[in-house]
């Protein structure tokens, strides 16, 4: 199930910049194993959902999964073959802004080998380089 905010204060946003590293959401809080971003990127709600589904399918009802990012930024696209001007395009999809160091998914209640395999499958769905981390 694709996620997006129930309501926002403004319909459209500036694109913004992704400079620096993530100072929030870079520690494992809930689970034992996690997937951590190593590069900055926009991750779409479809990519987040694909990774989550891949992990749950591999774990087969075992363990618990937490998704630590939420797509709260609307990306606008103007219709094809439209002339320039006449305002900004309409919101097309939602993205989560991810900086290096950010934890994307967490997992607990499974063995390390299963967690490593499940998280590596989810990592293949991501548009960035990631690493597998274990809570101390």
From Swiss-Prot:
InterPro entries: Ribosomal_uL16 (IPR047873), Ribosomal_uL16_bact-type (IPR000114), Ribosomal_uL16_CS (IPR020798), Ribosomal_uL16_dom (IPR016180), Ribosomal_uL16_sf (IPR036920)
SUPFAM superfamilies, per the entry: Ribosomal protein L16p/L10e (SSF54686)
One record GO biological process: mitochondrial translation
Localization of this protein: Plastid, Chloroplast
Keywords: Chloroplast, Plastid, Ribonucleoprotein, Ribosomal protein
Gene3D superfamilies: Ribosomal protein L10e/L16 (3.90.1170.10)
HAMAP family, per the entry: Ribosomal_uL16
UniProt-recorded name of the protein: Large ribosomal subunit protein uL16c
Gene (UniProt): rpl16
């Amino acid at each position: 199930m694709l996620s997006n905010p129930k309501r926002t204060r403004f319909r459209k946003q500036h694109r913004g910049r992704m400079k620096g590293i993530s100072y929030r959401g870079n520690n494992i809080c809930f689970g034992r194993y996690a997937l951590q971003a190593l590069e900055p990127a926009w991750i779409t709600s479809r990519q987040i959902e694909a990774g989550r589904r891949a992990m749950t399918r591999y774990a087969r009802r075992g363990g618990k999964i937490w998704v630590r990012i939420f797509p709260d930024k609307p990306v606008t696209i103007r219709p094809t073959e439209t002339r320039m001007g006449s305002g900004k395009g309409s919101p097309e999809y939602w993205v989560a802004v991810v900086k290096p160091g950010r934890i994307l998914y967490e997992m607990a209640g499974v063995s390390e080998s299963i967690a490593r395999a499940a998280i590596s499958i989810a990592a293949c769905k991501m548009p960035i380089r990631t690493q597998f981390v274990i809570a101390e």
